[in-house]
C-alpha cells in the first residue's frame, strides 16, 4: 500500500467522524438504555439503592469503559489491522502461521460474536419501545407488555425484511441520527447532574472496588454481569475498523465516551433525587421531562434500529470471512448495493430473524433479556485477547510485556465471564447453545477439509501432458468443449488431484482445445485480486493461480474472462475464432466448468471418527450453497461429477461363479 493510502486510513475528517458514529458505536451507544435499569432492578428497585451503591456502580462503568474499550480496543487492538480491516478473523489471519491451534480461539470467538449478534436487536429494540410506558397519553396502552412485543416484532420484521434490498439508501442518515442521539445523551446527562455534583466522585476507582465487597451490594461480584452491559459494543468497534478507518475512531471515541458517561451520571443523579418517590420506570426515560419523552422514545428507537443494523451487517461480514477462510459452509451471498462491502446472506438473515423473534417472544421484557445478555461476548473478548498476545509478539513486543499486558486483560475479562456465568440459568443457555452449534459446524467443516487434504492423492501433470495432447488431437472423440475448466483448491506446482486426471482421461475422455486448471487461493489481504499463469510449455494446458482477498467474491468466470483476454493479447494463447456468433469479432470459444464432488466410500483407510466428520460435513452441504453458486457459475455450462474420496481403495470381494451342473443321467 502507498504511504498516502496509509495516511488516509489514519486520518480523521468531519465526514468520517459522522460516519463512524453511525457505523461503529450503535451497540455501545445504546447501552445506556438498559444498563442502569439492570443495576437498579437487580438491587431491588430505586427505593433500595444508596448513594454509595450508585457511586460504586458509576465508578465500575467508567473504569470498565476505560480499561476494556479505551485501552484494550481503541489503543491496542485498533493497531492490529490486516490491511486496514479489523475483527477477530482479520486478527487470526495475521497470526495463524505462528501456531496451528490458534484456529480454536478464532472459531470460538467468531461463534460467540455471531450468537451475541442474534440477541442484540431483541434487547435494544425492546428497551426502546418499553420507553413508551413513560410517555403520557401512551402509557395506558403500553403498560400491557403484549403491545410492546407486537410493536417490537413489527420493527424487527421490517428491519430484517429490507436487508435483501440493501441498506445504502437509509445508511446515509445513520451518522446524523447517532450524532443527535449522543448529543442528547450528553446534554440531558449534564443537566441532570447539575444538582448532584457528588456523582463525580465516581471517577475515583475506590468506589468501584468498595462496592464489589460492600454488604450493600446484594449480588456481590455478580453485579459485574450488569456492569459489563456498558461495554458489550467494544468488540463491534474493532470489527468495524475497515469501514471508517483508525483515525476517525480515535477522534470520535472521546466524544462518544464523554456523552455516554454523562448519560450514566445523569441517570444516577435522577435516582439519588427520586429514590423515595416510588417511581419504578426505567431511569433512562424517567430522567427526562415527561413532555420530551415521546421524542426521546422515537430517537431511542431509531438508535436501536441503527445498532441492530450494524450487528446484522457485521454478522454477514463475519460469516463471509469465515467461508473464505474455509471454516464455515458456503452460503449464497448477494451484493444488493454498489459497494462490495454491502453484502447479504439470505440464510443467515432469516436465522438471525428467527432467533431474535424467538428471544422477544420467550423473554418478553428487556429486563429478562438483559439477564441473558453479555455472556457470549465475554468469551469473544477473551479469545481476542489470546490472539492479540500473539500479534504483539509478532510485531516485536518483548514477550514478557505481551504476556503481562494480555494476562491483565484476560484476568479482567475472566472475572466478567464468571460474573456473567450466572446468566446461564437465566436464559444465557440459549446463547451458549447457539454458540456451541456454530462452533460444531465450524469444527466439522475445518476438520473435513483437513481429512480431504490427508487422503486425496496428487499426480504430476507433466507425466500426463502427452496423453492429454493425444486426446486433444484425437478426432475419434467428439469435441467435448472448446475450453474445459477444472477448479481445485489443492493444486501445488504441477501436482494436481488425481480425481481431475481421472475425469479427463478415464471417466469419459474429454476432448477440448484448452484445458484449464484453476486454483482459487484466499489471501490474508482483504481486497486482493491477482493471478499467476503457467502454460506448462504448451498452448493447450493452462494452470491458473487466482489470489483473492478474504473479502472478495469468488466469481471465477468474471476473472477468467479477463485472464483469457490477457493471454490472447500477449500471444500466449491462440485465438479461438467462432464461425457462428452474434458477436462480431468474437475470438473466445465456449467454456464448460467441471466440478468434482468427493464422497465417502467404504474406504478402509478412514477411521470411525474421520468417517463421522466426512458424513456430517456431507449432510451440512445439503443445506448450503452449491459450489456452482459460490464460484458464480449459475449462468455457465457446468458438469458435476461424483468420485469416491479415496480412488485407490478398490476392494476385491470374495465371490464365486455358479457353473451349471450337467444332468448326471444324460
Curated annotation (Swiss-Prot):
Keyword terms of this UniProt record: Cell membrane, Ion transport, Membrane, Potassium, Potassium transport, Symport, Transmembrane, Transmembrane helix, Transport
GO CC terms in record: plasma membrane
Catalytic reactions on record: K(+)(in) + H(+)(in) = K(+)(out) + H(+)(out)
Major place of residence: membrane
Record bears the keyword Transmembrane helix: yes
UniProt signal peptide: none
Keyword Nucleotide-binding: no
GO MF term list: potassium ion transmembrane transporter activity; symporter activity
Lipid bilayer topology: Multi-pass membrane protein
Pfam families hit by this protein: K_trans, K_trans_C
InterPro entries: K+_transporter, K_trans_C, K_trans_N, Kup
Transmembrane segments: 16-36, 58-78, 100-120, 141-161, 165-185, 221-241, 253-273, 294-314, 343-363, 373-393, 399-419, 424-444
Subcellular location: Cell membrane
Protein role: Transport of potassium into the cell. Likely operates as a K(+):H(+) symporter.
Alphabetized PANTHER family for the sequence: K+ POTASSIUM TRANSPORTER, OSMOTIC STRESS POTASSIUM TRANSPORTER
Family assignment from sequence similarity: Belongs to the HAK/KUP transporter (TC 2.A.72) family.
Protein name: Probable potassium transport system protein Kup
Lineage: Bacteria, Bacillati, Bacillota, Bacilli, Lactobacillales
